[in-house]
Amino acid sequence: MTGRFAPTPSGRMHIGNVYAMLGAWLSARKSGDSIRLRIEDIDEPRVVPGAAETMMRDLEWLGLGWDDEPVFQSSRHALYQEALELLSKLSFDEISDIISTGSNDSKPCSTTAGNEAATSEATPLIYPCFCSRADIRAASAPQEGDRFTVYPGTCRRLIASEPQRAKQRLANNDRHSMRIATADTTITFHDEVFGTQQYNLAHDIGDIIVRRSDGIYSYQLAVTVDDLDMGITDIVRGRDLLRSNALQIYIRKALINAGFKPSEPTQPFHPADGSNKPDDVTISYAHLPLIDNAAGQRLAKRERSLDLGILTAHGATAQQIIGYCAWLLGLQGDLKHTKPQPMSADEALGVFSWDAVRTNTSDRTLDQGEFNAYSDCRPYSAVLFCSFILQLYSAIAFSQSIIPNQADIR
């Protein structure tokens, strides 16, 4: 199996990033497997110059090494365009039939089909969307917790009922994004932390953007293409991406059946027919609990969590940071009855198991008393350390920026 780090270089890494990256590193190394580094810099306006290089130095300092050369999304535009063109050749009916019959894999997930709308025959798998954000906000109710807004299907109906009107708008160069039509199908998969998960694509997710109106490929398309192309089979990230996982399984199946050829194909564990199709493999998914503030909300990036540069400037060591993240993962015992202890990444590897992580699947909540107790072993003041703790959790799933932003899901 192959794991991956997938940070976004929009600034210096926070402890929240390290928490998720440690989980990914431990999962891969515990099985003796490789782990790749992918810099998710496709949304170039958000990239901070030099952040990727600093991020790599920080990972090495923490003892979280990776295998092979880093991969940069910014150098893979041609690959994403190729993937989009392949998907565009499929009709909605074709992929709906494929998804409803399941796959040849060794059961990382399964699908259950529902009843499709009467207009599905006229719907391409990839279609243009002319809706503005305001249009979608007015017609949709946001889903709780993970920022998904289910698209109401306005342009999908337009293309089915008035195809000439849609073609004319394209001919007029009207600003538009590109969406993928989702089937009335339930995706079921096993998560190492949260167990069996089920999401209906049409009702829980909807038709999501795969290329934005500014020409930038969406997170959902890029990460699915990358994981498939790089042979990633061990995916660890925050639980706010559970719903995205179902969507990415759908896109992955569509890509495979459209003829996408990975540059680093995975080898099947137990191929039924001797084939090397990329859907013959088992993929391991693990989504980590999030960390909330005292109000039960994730801290926003605008609250300026302290980064590793500030922490190291005030004396924090790699062992202290790794130890704290290992404690958050549940690797040092019950969070309610233990306090964190410094440890190296290799020491954390010695005690890592998913059983320990899944012992407590609740989101972690800031507790001032626990943090004050931990400050007793810090080489800098308790006041400074408490300030550090209160701000360090603005990012959890490899940074907030990998969570599908509103431009990606509308």
Mark where each language-model region is.
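N-terminal Rossmann-like or analogous alpha/beta NTP/dinucleotide-binding catalytic cores
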Residues: M1-E144, D240, S244-F260, F269, ...
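Short, solvent-exposed secondary-structure boundary motifs
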Residues: N17, Y199-N200, D408
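Exposed alpha-helical structural elements
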Residues: L79, D135, V150, Q320, ...
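Non-catalytic terminal extensions that flank enzyme cores
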Residues: M1-S10, I35, I95-G102, K107-E121, ...
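Short C-terminal domain-edge/linker segments immediately following a structured domain
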Residues: W66-P70, V210-D214, R252-L255, A316-Y324
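Short, functional N-terminal and low-complexity linear motifs
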Residues: A20-S27, V48-T54, R212-Y219, H287-A294, ...
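Active-site cores that bind ATP or allylic diphosphates and position pyrophosphate for catalysis
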Residues: G102-T123, R133-E264, F269-A300, D307-T312, ...
